[in-house]
Regions:
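Class II aminoacyl-tRNA synthetase catalytic cores and aaRS-like
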Residues: 1-242
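Compact, charge-rich alpha-helical regulatory domains located at protein termini
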Residues: 239-314
């Protein structure tokens, strides 16, 4: 549940794909071929101009471990660092509220602050620390890392994928660690999903899975500047609320409290809104709402409406 900006919308379309007996290496190869073919189908070429950048979707894409990406872009080498050492680095580059973050969240924030926005050409950021990836299989040859990648294009994440964790014992331990992070104040930590654990206990084959943001994919393939341009019904800024007279102000001209929301429903928000209205028109509007919504109020006589109007004009 994220906010709204040029690349985020509270409601979005996502494609999830799972393939048994495959791993994240296969999924990277599949993804780069898929995007190359989509780009050719949409644009007749493998290149798209997005703002000032020309992005090439021609496979293969660069594959870069996340810790190497941070080192390349910022100069900070986080490999082998303790949580406290990483926290001090995060503080030094201006990241706030670090005391609430675990090791994985700290690395994620440092990557976002120093590296993410710099990857314009499609780049697979791979091999995330286990603290950042509670649903991902451990790396087959790199202790402490997982078989996960995120695809960065034009400075934003387009896809997230893993070799799926299918060991129920390991998964339960990961969930417990997430609960400990939640206790520390991490609002992005996961809760224990007992149904998921039970399903893993029944058995799940080795699997690779990926999620691709379709709205972001549409932005990239069509060269649009914002996500709002590719959504049928984009989230809009809330309308400004009309100013309203208080119940006391309405009472001052003789309007009983129960009729104030009815007047508002009719479009009369301020006492001054009824000054130029004929009593018969006001009666018709107010009594119409009373009837339509079955409020059960005794309708005022036209003389009472006239009295409200006269008082409003004093």
């Amino acid at each position: 549940n994220e906010g709204m900006d040029r690349s985020h919308n509270p409601e979005f379309t996502c494609m999830e794909l799972y393939v048994s007996y495959k791993d994240y290496n296969w999924m990277m190869s599949f993804t780069e071929k898929l995007l190359e073919e989509i780009c050719i189908a949409v644009n007749g070429t493998t290149e798209v101009k997005i703002g000032d950048n020309v992005v090439s979707f021609k496979a293969p894409y660069r594959r870069l471990p996340i810790l190497e990406a941070i080192k390349e872009k910022s100069g900070y080498d986080l490999e082998g660092k303790t949580e406290e050492e990483i926290r001090e680095i995060a503080k030094s580059i201006g990241i706030e509220d670090t005391e609430l973050m675990g090791k994985g969240k700290l690395i994620d924030e440092i990557f976002g602050e120093t590296a993410e926005g710099t990857f314009i050409q499609p780049t697979f950021i791979t091999d995330y620390p286990v603290e950042m990836s509670p649903l991902t299989k451990m790396h087959r040859s790199k202790p402490g890392l997982t078989e996960r990648f995120e695809l960065m294009v034009n400075g934003k994440e387009l896809a997230n994928a893993y070799s799926e964790l299918n060991d129920p014992i390991d998964q339960e331990e990961r969930f417990m660690e997430q609960m400990r992070l939640a206790d520390k104040g991490d609002d992005e930590a996961m809760v224990i999903d007992h149904d998921f654990l039970r399903a893993l206990q029944y058995g799940m084959p080795p699997t690779s899975g990926i999620g691709i943001g379709i709205d972001r994919l549409a932005i990239l393939m069509t060269g649009q500047p914002t996500i709002q341009e590719v959504l049928l019904f984009p989230t809009m800024k809330p309308e400004k609320k009309a100013p309203k007279s208080s119940v006391a102000e309405w009472a001052a001209v003789g309007v009983p409290e129960q009729w104030v929301p009815v007047l508002n429903k009719c479009g009369y928000y301020l006492v001054q809104d009824i000054k130029e209205v004929k009593a018969q028109k006001l009666q018709q509007d107010v009594c119409g709402v009373n009837k339509k919504y079955k409020l059960g109020y005794d309708n005022p006589k036209v003389e009472e409406f006239q009295q409200w109007i006269d008082n409003a004009n004093k």
